[in-house]
Amino acid sequence: MNNKSKRMSAAGLLIAIGIVYGDIGTSPLYVMKSIVKAMGGIGNVNREFIIGSISLVLWTVTLLTTLQTVIIALKATNHGEGGIFALYTLVRKRAKWLVLPALIGGAAILADGTLTPAVTVTTAIEGLKGLQLGGGVPVSSQSMVIAITVLILLVLFSIQKMGTSIIGKAFGPIMFVWFTFLGVIGLINMSGDWSILQAINPVYAIKLLFSPYNKAGIFILGSIFLATTGAEALYSDVGHVGKKNIIGSWPFVFVCLSLNYFGQGVWILNNPTYRPADGGVLNPFYEMIPSDFRLAAIILATIAAVIASQALITGSFTLVAEASGLKFLPRMKIDYPSTEKGQIYIPSINKGICVATIAIVLYFQTSAHMEAAYGLSITISMLMTTILLYEWLAMKKVNPVWNWIFLIFFGVLDIMFMISSLTKFTHGGYVSLFIAGAIGFIMYVWYYGNKIRDKREARNAYVRLDEYTDMLTNLSHDENYPTYATNLVYMANVKYNKFIKREILYSILDKRPKRAKAYWFVTVNVTNEPFTAEYAVNTYGTKNVINIQLYLGFKKQTSVNVYIRQIVHDLIADGTIEPQPQEYTTTPGRDVGDFSFVIVNDVISPQTQLIGYEKWLVEARVRLQNLSSNPASWFGLEYADTVIERVPLS
């Protein structure tokens, strides 16, 4: 999105409603259903319980979404970009251990990306079960619900490679209609008992936690927390829609959500003996809708659920790309299906989320069972975000008293919700923890495996590149050797602008002398700023040996092939390097020669001097490297002439 659309405007507000609020906007589909089910059904709840539950929902959303996210977290942006990884880049220099909450929180959010589509779409489709259409009941069993859900999810994941820029333009108007519908239907039901507004008083929320009518006790917070899942999207998507558009649109969304929860509460109070016609789990959201409008509501809810799922999938792609840039995950093949900035598609992640989401649907079978697994991982990510926000506030020199109040207040809240959600572990919560744990393990291995490798490399033989420039220049002009390439490009880490691994020069000079018109040594540096694209050049007084330091933002596409070609054009134009006129070419006036790229990868060998934990960690990292995409794709060199050379790690 361009900067103009990030300013608050009617269009910007509409776009924000379509992109940001899908997850939290579909929470009314299952929050009250989960709360009532936790009490054993509608017959086991009374007025005090319902008013207290609605109060807990409202104040949970107010504190965790409005106060912590909209008012506080949206201030902690990195050049306009938000999310847990952007927050980490702001504070990582304060302490090395801060990488742990970033890894844990990121893994938990990615795990949520597999659960949200399963829960929201299944819940929406369950509204069709038992509904009479044309004198019959087309969806008469849960098996049919599951079949329809899986079909919708398969279609959703299959269209990701085509991009969502076209259908994405409709998200805003559709979600605006959805939220308006939530508010209107809630207001209509509220008219049956305006005393439900007592729930605005937080005293009722506190009383419920200790009330004898509350059989679940404090653990009811596990169901209450579902109302605020999706709050993290307000922070992570701020770079797409702009801070002002989120701040401006949130009051409308919050009011519509509140009205709907009020309406569901009134319906429950007015129907204490109601039993669903199909004998299944009661869902107040659908039951409070007049039967004549039920089908339209289900269709709208399904579309909203798909939009919420789409937002989570797109967010997962972005999160993985950021994690790769920060060396939390292996680099993966990234496609750009649209010219729209920031829209990416990662085939391997799309397949992984698709398989995991459908497996969750098939395993749990009902949305009620899925809700048992839902929310646990997000409580963990919120606690990690609170820790990082505390460090950010300290970095900003906020009064230490207020900073500690923030940490204690929100830390205690997050821990309470996490403890209450732990009761879900045996009822399916282990699934979300397993997924988050697997992702976190991969991140840990990759990050710390790289750290150990880099530490070993620092002890290995490095040579000064500037001491070999004469030899490289002579080889470049030595016609006794065939030309290997016009431009020979090594993806090499040149430290302090002059030190390079001996193996790289060995590859050029000793292995089989590689003659080239120009030798390029390219280092890719990931910056804290999200969209940096800069470079620095050092030719060491030659026209044949060039050290390029690329500085790319952690959200920037790593297309080294494209960048290097442009740099060559620039350096030829200003006379820094020799011209490369092409006598034989299909492109008239072509002044840049061919390119050959070389990537040197480390491998574990019997000579590798590693033992115990460090050896295991580096070996695991190498296995992950082998399982991930071709190293050429890491640097955007899939279609370039690229050679992978392997050298043993000493």
Curated annotation (Swiss-Prot):
Q: Which InterPro entries match?
A: K+_transporter, K_trans_C, K_trans_N, Kup
What's the protein's topology in the membrane? Multi-pass membrane protein
Q: Which reactions fall under this protein's catalytic activity?
A: K(+)(in) + H(+)(in) = K(+)(out) + H(+)(out)
Q: Which GO terms describe its molecular function?
A: potassium ion transmembrane transporter activity; symporter activity
Out of the domains of life, which is the source? Bacteria
Major subcellular location class: membrane
Protein name (record): Probable potassium transport system protein Kup 1
The source organism is Lactobacillus acidophilus (strain ATCC 700396 / NCK56 / N2 / NCFM)
The organism's taxonomy opens as: Bacteria, Bacillati, Bacillota, Bacilli, Lactobacillales
Q: Quote the gene name from the UniProt entry.
A: kup1
